[in-house]
């Protein structure tokens, strides 16, 4: 969308230019100034305007910048971002005084948003996976009183789906909507190893330390798991940690880390079988797990015939290169980032030989 006035067009053109610090006063006089720093814009790969400031060096979407300006009651930027094409209706989620509401009305805002519009804005805002954007999303959504008054069943379902790999997903039913959103953003930060965001949540929400640990184990983030184990008092047994790591298939990094700290590989294999995590099962045998018959019985009880067939072969043994019990996350990542199970390879070869 093109700016509605020549002045807005000129400001948009200026915001795309490199300006030396000596000329920052020009940007300030033109209203291209926010959080004590200049505003610049760029067009992303989806042809969307992105706003970049000192606080958001990686950029935020134009609509997100608008609602933040509304939250701050920054009238000049509300008008500027609207002229640049931001959807003024989204500002309704963050209005906190009548004067700003009247300004939004003058700029064309309706009286209230539909649930579908709220969900659309939620998706638009959260799609940029950076530390600054995850923190911003938390600040915009987690304690927003407007969301408390809207039927957010659809949003809860979206969050459940995105956190489906977490074994404690069902616990999200037992907490407030605000707390659920906070845990969601914290989980996203851990899942993508966003270090600045993790540090922010760690400092602000010390009572969520166990949630951080659960997310690190479940999302295979060995780097954050190592950080937690070395900086936080953990109130969870190492075998319970291994159990959480085994709930999601292909979690080799966190499974190995728990193994290196002393977790039982046989127990891990049984948990992997129970959860039909076949790659984890093979990896546990690589680590020396040898409860083959017990695992076969368990697989038979659950009706996992493919696992029963796999474990019927007498070809599995530990992989010596995994038995050093390394706890350096960089070395673990190097060892396992392209790892293919030695026992899975043996099974593949056996299947090929039988086929031939």
UniProtKB/Swiss-Prot annotation:
GO terms for biological process: taxis. Plays a role in virus cell tropism, and may be required for efficient virus replication in macrophages. ANK repeats lie at residues 61-93. InterPro entries: ASFV_MGF360. Disulfide bonds: none annotated. It comes from African swine fever virus (strain Badajoz 1971 Vero-adapted). The keyword rRNA-binding does not apply. This is Protein MGF 360-3L. Belongs to the asfivirus MGF 360 family. Keywords: ANK repeat.
């Amino acid at each position: 969308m093109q700016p509605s006035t020549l002045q807005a067009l000129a400001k948009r053109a200026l915001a795309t230019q490199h300006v030396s610090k000596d000329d920052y006063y020009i940007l300030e006089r033109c209203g291209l100034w926010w959080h004590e720093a200049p505003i610049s814009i760029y067009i992303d790969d989806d042809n969307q305007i992105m706003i970049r400031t000192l606080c958001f060096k990686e950029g935020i979407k134009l609509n997100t910048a608008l609602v933040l300006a509304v939250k701050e009651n920054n009238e000049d930027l509300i008008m500027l971002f609207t002229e640049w094409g931001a959807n003024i209706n989204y500002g309704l989620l963050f209005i906190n005084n009548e004067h700003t509401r009247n300004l939004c009305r003058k700029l064309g805002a309706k009286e209230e948003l539909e649930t579908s519009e709220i969900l659309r804005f939620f998706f638009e805002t959260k799609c940029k996976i950076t530390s600054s954007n995850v923190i911003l999303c938390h600040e915009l959504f987690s304690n927003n009183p407007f969301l408390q008054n809207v039927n957010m069943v659809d949003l809860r379902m979206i969050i459940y789906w995105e956190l489906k790999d977490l074994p404690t997903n069902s616990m999200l039913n037992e907490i407030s909507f605000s707390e659920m959103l906070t845990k969601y953003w914290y989980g996203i930060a851990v899942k993508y190893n966003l270090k600045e965001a993790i540090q922010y949540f760690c400092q602000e929400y010390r009572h969520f330390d166990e949630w951080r640990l659960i997310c690190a184990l479940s999302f295979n983030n060995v780097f954050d798991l190592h950080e937690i184990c070395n900086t936080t008092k953990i109130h969870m047994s190492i075998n319970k940690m291994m159990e959480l790591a085994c709930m999601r298939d292909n979690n080799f990094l966190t499974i190995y880390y728990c193994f290196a700290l002393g977790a039982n590989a046989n127990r891990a294999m049984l948990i992997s079988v129970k959860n039909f995590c076949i790659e984890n099962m093979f990896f546990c045998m690589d680590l020396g797990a040898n409860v083959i018959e017990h695992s076969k019985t368990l697989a038979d009880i659950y009706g996992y015939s493919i696992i029963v067939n796999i474990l019927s072969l007498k070809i599995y043994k530990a992989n010596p290169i995994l038995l050093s019990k390394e706890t350096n996350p960089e070395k673990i990542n190097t060892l396992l980032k392209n790892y293919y199970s030695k026992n899975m390879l043996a099974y593949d070869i056996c299947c090929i030989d039988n086929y031939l």
